[in-house]
From Swiss-Prot:
This is Enlarged germline granules protein 1. It comes from Caenorhabditis elegans. The keyword Cytoplasm applies. Residues 142-156 have a biased composition (Basic and acidic residues). It is found in: Cytoplasm; Cytoplasmic granule.
């Protein structure tokens, strides 16, 4: 018969209640924590059990070997070890090869790769001959195993029936009729501003390029100049020293001919031969 006291924690005595934990340093026995100790690490004395765990029990000066242990850098991996790590990552990433890696190692599937060590003083360049064919991407091995592969056949219009059903309907647009477009150009004037009284129609002419449609006559519309006046159009373009356009401004000026003398000439200079007289 058990008295029911097994496994129960004993009640703390008055001595344990009065005890208060005060943090102290192991090395200098002060009231700060061990990582706050101002003494350097190398001057601290190691206990015997720590010397044996490190392997410095038989040494005369254990601090020398500790400095040597901390000062030696880690060994860098060679190019062969890096190559084996990359091959292991690539083989473990593929789900098809992961199934076979449980039974036999990944090196069973890997062919022998003779890769020379990298040389930093010379850059390796791939030289292709003139008669060699260009590089072509090979298809994935999953496409070769599928009997319903569509690599050599026409591709599907959509991946799913829902995407095909919800696709936007494209309207079939017929090519514009040339005769119909020319009639629209006659009706819709290219320069429309103000009322019809400000415009005049010139004599119809036929373009030299459209010899097939000689019966179609195109009337040209241009602004009507008031009597006794003339318009002067000017355009200013400012370029910087590099030849880039900074600003371009166009303007028109109306000149009254009645205010001038009868024999006073008007000289208009066109730099780009865009004005026709």
């Amino acid at each position: 018969m058990s008295n029911g006291k097994r496994g129960r924690k004993a009640k703390p005595t008055n001595k344990e209640k009065d005890m208060i934990f005060t943090p102290g340093c192991v090395d200098c026995h002060m009231n700060h924590l061990p990582f706050q100790c101002p003494r350097p690490v190398m001057t601290k004395k190691l206990p015997e059990w720590e010397k044996k765990s490190i392997g410095m029990g038989k040494l005369k000066n254990p601090l020398d070997s500790k400095v040597k242990m901390y000062s030696e850098p880690a060994r860098q991996t060679t190019w062969k070890e890096k190559l084996s790590q990359l091959n292991h990552e690539n083989m473990s990433y593929n789900a098809h090869n992961k199934r076979s890696s449980r039974q036999r190692g990944n090196s069973y599937r890997l062919p022998q790769q003779n890769i020379p060590p990298p040389s930093h003083h010379q850059s390796s360049q791939v030289m292709r001959g003139f008669q060699n064919a260009p590089f072509q991407m090979q298809p994935h091995y999953n496409n070769e195993r599928k009997p319903q592969s569509r690599r050599n056949d026409t591709m599907r219009a959509s991946k799913s029936a829902y995407a095909a059903a919800t696709a936007p309907v494209k309207k079939h647009v017929r090519p514009a009729n040339e005769q119909h477009m020319r009639k629209l150009n006659d009706l819709l004037r290219p320069f429309s501003y103000g009322s019809d009284d400000l415009y005049e129609e010139t004599q119809p002419f036929v373009k030299e390029t459209s010899l097939a449609n000689v019966d179609i006559q195109i009337c040209q519309t241009r602004p009507k100049v008031p009597p006794g006046k003339m318009w002067i159009f000017e355009s200013r373009t400012i370029y910087d020293e590099n030849g880039n356009c900074v600003s371009a401004r166009e303007g028109a000026m109306e000149v009254s001919l009645a205010s001038r003398m009868h024999n006073e000439p008007i000289v208009i200079v066109s730099m780009n031969d865009s004005m026709c007289f």
